[in-house]
Amino acid sequence: MGGVRNHLVLQGVYKGQRIRKELGIPLDAKVVLSVGEVNKNKNHKVGIEALAKLRDKNTYYVICGRGPLMEAHKELAQSLGVGDRVVLTGYRTDVADFYKMADVFLFPSFREGLPVAVMEAMASGLPVVATRIRGSSDLVQQGDLFEPTDVDGIAKAIETLQQSNAKYETAVFDIHKVMESMKTIYGV
């Protein structure tokens, strides 16, 4: 057929799969993503502690960024028994691809001016769990806000979003269902 595409390419799906493969994260795993310098203010520690409380042990916490607390966070993850599910990537130039592979965005900062990472996550369509601070509380309307030290609240918010996200994906955007629909519509 001249000029008619008979296949559908979803770049975001493939880039997300590439990142998961590179990081050793199973394709069926849930991914919680944080982006930012690994320092005390960014408070990634609370994300690691929340991961340890999640019932779904097939959930990974990916932190994109580098900073002075990388080793301390690795040690904390090991001590909580989640060292194999916490990934500190260091500095990355392909952060946009990380948003495509994540299921939930976690922004646990103690303080922030204009939270660019939250805006990027929202623009990528990710549900956001963020601290109730200036900036993020103005932006986050679909997601959950919590106090920076509320580990249980963060864990519960992540689980709630994962469950609702899984239902949405299954019902609305299963890639195989979309491909079958496209084949039926175009008779391919």
Kindly give the residue locations of the regions a language model identified.
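A conserved mid-protein helix/loop that constitutes part of the nucleotide-sugar donor-binding site
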Residues: K30-K53, P68-K74
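Short hydrophobic beta-strand element within catalytic cores of glycosyltransferases
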Residues: P127-A130
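A charged, aromatic-enriched C-terminal amphipathic alpha-helix characteristic of glycosyltransferases
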Residues: S164-V188
